[in-house]
Amino acid sequence: MAKEQVQAITKMEEDFAQWYTDIVKKAELVDYSSVKGCMILRPYGYALWENMQKVMDEKLKATGHENVYMPMFIPESLLQKEKDHVEGFAPEVAWVTHGGDEKLAERLCVRPTSETLFCEHFSKIVQSYNDLPKLYNQWCSVVRWEKTTRPFLRTTEFLWQEGHTIHETAEESQAETLNILNLYASFCEDYLAIPVIKGQKTEKEKFAGAKATYTIESLMHDGKALQTGTSHNFGTNFSEAFDIKFLDRNGKWQYVHQTSWGVSTRMIGGLIMVHSDNNGLVMPPKVAPVQVVIVPIAQHKEGVLAKATELQGHIQKVARVKIDASNKTPGWKFNEYEMKGIPIRLEVGPKDIEKNQVVLVRRDTKEKEFISMDQLEERIPALLEEIHNSLFNKAKVFRDENTYSVTNFEEMKKLADEKQGFIKAMWCGELACEEKLKEEVASRCMPFEQEHLAEECVCCVNKWCIGEKRINALLDRKDEKDFGLHNKCNPKSFLVLQFVSCIFKMEG
């Protein structure tokens, strides 16, 4: 039975999408519901989310953020107040049109995100600069009517946190936006062992209604990218639309400066696709629901279960631990907990008790060692840290080995046909060049850590963006000085690009 269970996992090299689906099902993270695109988070999957939520919640509260809860329904008239925002979400909105048998006077949107609700509330409670800042966070579910779904990565309903803050100055809101992005990045790296690239989205890729959108991007096992979290600076775009004003220190009315940011259960999907293997899930230790499983060997023999229970008592001081005292065979248990990705397995039997030792097996490397029972409380925390570092370093090496630099469009196109991963290239910032790039690749971000890869933009070097169409667009600005500057390519940033075949990207 155990072998059949393991063999049922499709190899990632054969079909990555099916491999992923096999793992989330067989590791008992989720089950499918009767509603298309909605998943049931099983106890093991929800415990993982709870651990992630607990860490994030503590970090947000430590920086002065307060938890609130907004309604799940948004009146259509309220949603329409920010035009760009509405257009960005319109295809994904679910509408409530009836209450019982009665048709509603106004349609209600099932929240795809809660900006409009927070804005309405802020407009009622803010009068003076003394009322600022407001640093709010919400843990909830949202609904986006996706056509193509996959557990954790793209679902009709999903769990997330969304933060919404308002500030007195533009500088404060920008600092908040970047501080949260850094918080997300450190959470991914320090708890999920996922290396990320921090950067800014292009004007075309930014969140609907935002002044600027910042992102953390990760590379999965199959060489495709995942947007793991985003932080948005709204400037005064929403506060002007919703009339969120305050009396400043000089007695003048000003619009508040606003931010919005969020991460979701998509992080669990990223965790799976970065660390897991063809034997099942591999859990980063710091968020694993169970960090150590004890498997008694020949548990029917006198003293074995008692010793396992005694060891559990010691280990639970330093780690999350369970004993499997079921009647299943040790072999079945080994395969089961390998499938579920528990970082450390301890085996204890009569011979081990005689020697005052246990057999310790790492899930990530499958390395086995014999260790004295007296050393477990010291060894296990150190080993959990070793496993975390090993997973992070392995993922970082994979990302770096699958990141390429190009200097012209043809080189980029050839690379996109032959490889999977990230491409780094210079970009001048012009929309015409970005449109040309997107014919072959998907833009991910403009990384904060810049490199000077070439003297010209990857498209400008081929003269595609400085022809008649571009000149006309610049002439429409009626600014000859500006035209003169832009007619000569002056790349100031580079894009991390990811191949167009990516199926896991979901905005928001």
Swiss-Prot record:
Annotated PROSITE patterns:
AA_TRNA_LIGASE_II (PS50862)
Origin superkingdom? Bacteria
The answer to keyword Protein biosynthesis applying to this record is yes
Q: Name one GO cellular component term.
A: cytoplasm
UniProt keyword terms in alphabetical order: Aminoacyl-tRNA synthetase, ATP-binding, Cytoplasm, Ligase, Nucleotide-binding, Protein biosynthesis
Q: Does the keyword Aminoacyl-tRNA synthetase apply?
A: yes
Spell out the Pfam families in the cross-references.
HGTP_anticodon, ProRS-C_1, tRNA-synt_2b
A Gene Ontology BP annotation from the UniProt entry: prolyl-tRNA aminoacylation
The UniProt record lists the EC number as 6.1.1.15
Protein localization: Cytoplasm
Q: For this UniProt entry, what is the primary localization, expressed as one broad class?
A: cytoplasm
Task: Enumerate the InterPro entries for this protein.
Answer: aa-tRNA-synt_IIb (IPR002314), aa-tRNA-synth_II (IPR006195), aa-tRNA-synth_II/BPL/LPL (IPR045864), Anticodon-bd (IPR004154), Anticodon-bd_dom_sf (IPR036621), Pro-tRNA-ligase_IIa (IPR002316), Pro-tRNA-ligase_IIa_arc-type (IPR004499), Pro-tRNA_ligase_II_C (IPR016061)
The Swiss-Prot or TrEMBL note on domains reads: Consists of three domains: the N-terminal catalytic domain, the anticodon-binding domain and the C-terminal extension.
Q: Which PANTHER family match?
A: BIFUNCTIONAL GLUTAMATE_PROLINE--TRNA LIGASE (PTHR43382:SF2), PROLYL-TRNA SYNTHETASE (PTHR43382)
Q: Which family does it belong to?
A: Belongs to the class-II aminoacyl-tRNA synthetase family. ProS type 3 subfamily.
Self-association state and partner proteins as the record states: Homodimer.
Instruction: Give the protein's function.
Output: Catalyzes the attachment of proline to tRNA(Pro) in a two-step reaction: proline is first activated by ATP to form Pro-AMP and then transferred to the acceptor end of tRNA(Pro).
Q: What is this protein called?
A: Proline--tRNA ligase 2
Organism equals Bacillus anthracis
